[in-house]
Amino acid sequence: LHDIINLNEFATYANMKVNPGEEKYYPQANGEMRYVYGENLDSYKADPTNPANYRVINYVDWQKEAYSSALSQIYSASVSGGSDAVQYYVSANFKNIKGIVENTGIKQGDLRLNLTANLSKAVKLTLNMNGSLQQNDMMTGGNTTGGVAGSLARTVLDTAPYRTPSDDPSLLDNMDAKTNVDSWKNDYDDIINDKKFNASADLLWKINKHFSYNLRAGGGVSVNDRNRWYGMTLTIGANDEGVLAVSNTDKSNYSIENILNYNVDLTKKIHLDATAGLTYDVHTFLNKNVKGTRFSNFDLRTKGLHLASIIKHDQPTQKDYQLLSYLGRVNLSAYDKYLLTASLRADGSSKFK
């Protein structure tokens, strides 16, 4: 943590910045710090004993209010076994990682399955599947403009080391004056729900001593939902009477590869291997963004989009493509010294392992 000035040091600094007679901070012999609004300065100087003319403020270390030690928990279990014909591996994991900022953290569960099966002496099948569910409750990462309106980290460093009295007139004129660490902790949500699933299969068929066939298929699905809420004690939320930004991103892909391999020794010193294949890839991407403002009720926060008076739907972003590719390659090696290669690629998408 940074070495932050205390309340007395801040009062001395703030009083030095203004003209004589306009000081707002008055430390007392008993350790009390009095804060005087600009319009009450004359009244306070005339009667400094009248509590109506000042407010007592207390020192707040915003770093300690914002950050604290966090506990992380990780649990995992796995099972493996099988026989000569079939082998399997199953694992499960759960993570509960608390953030150093209150009400932030990650919860994630994962499940994985690996299976290998010898269907015959010539055919082998390998399956891999995994999925995960994740909820990430984050704190804002800031923006390029800085200042207390941008992020908690800047608010911690830029805010005066005390809580501004609620009846301070400056709160009416300066929106940023309302924003402190409490605002970010209690009036901001950034929740991401992420779902992922991936699967692949690899079938190898050794047709004879020269030919082998490989079929690979795999794909994945990803669903990402993000909801950000700015309440009335944050500048962004106060400007629009509450702001809820909702983002949904859906991605998926799958691919199929058919590979035929040929290997032969033409002589004791000359070897030939050839590959021919066909691949097909499909990718989809869709992103939707919705923004709600002018809320009539603030209690539902990230779940209250229907309470917004103004709902703006941005133009969705969609990126889909399919690719069909052909490939071929021939390698001729001689005497373990010379190599001649010829290859054919269609669409520039061929891949060799």
Language-model segments: residues:
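Transmembrane beta-strand segments of Gram-negative outer membrane beta-barrel proteins
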Residues: 1, 60, 85-92
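Surface-exposed loop/interface segments of Gram-negative outer-membrane beta-barrel transport/assembly proteins
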Residues: 1-58, 69, 99-106, 110-198, ...
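Outer-membrane beta-barrel initiation region
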Residues: 66-70, 76-83
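Outer-membrane beta-barrel channels and translocator barrels
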Residues: 72, 83-84, 120-122, 206-208, ...
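Membrane-spanning beta-strand positions in outer-membrane beta-barrel proteins
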Residues: 76, 87-91, 118, 124-128, ...
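Short glycine-rich loop/turn motifs
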Residues: 76, 255, 323-328, 337-339
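Ligand-site clamp/hinge motif
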Residues: 95-97
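Conserved catalytic-core segments centered on acid/base and nucleophilic motifs
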Residues: 203, 328-334, 338-344, 349-353
